[in-house]
Amino acid sequence: AYIDTHTAKTERQSVLVSLDRDGRVLRVDVTVFFEPAQYMAPQDFLRQYDGAVLHEELVIRRGIRPIAGASFTGRAVNNAVRRVLALDQVLQSTALSDVQ
């Protein structure tokens, strides 16, 4: 699991991105959110990432439905999930090359 802290619109938020052994998203949870509550990503938005892997369709308005009225939050969460998936790929490939 990874925690990504970033700015949503003007304030910080942290998301916990849990991955399985194969690098697929198990779940995404918001752990800290300092923006107004109405801009927080709802659970049905976050559940879209369940089972996701890093690919070109993992973006808002392609493979991910946007959040009405909270586009900054949606983009920030999407960017965080993509960062975590990319970081995990790098760390996993580094770990595999260290074993060989």
Give residue ranges: language-model regions:
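Flexible, solvent-exposed loop/hinge segments and secondary-structure transition points
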Residues: 1-75, 79-100
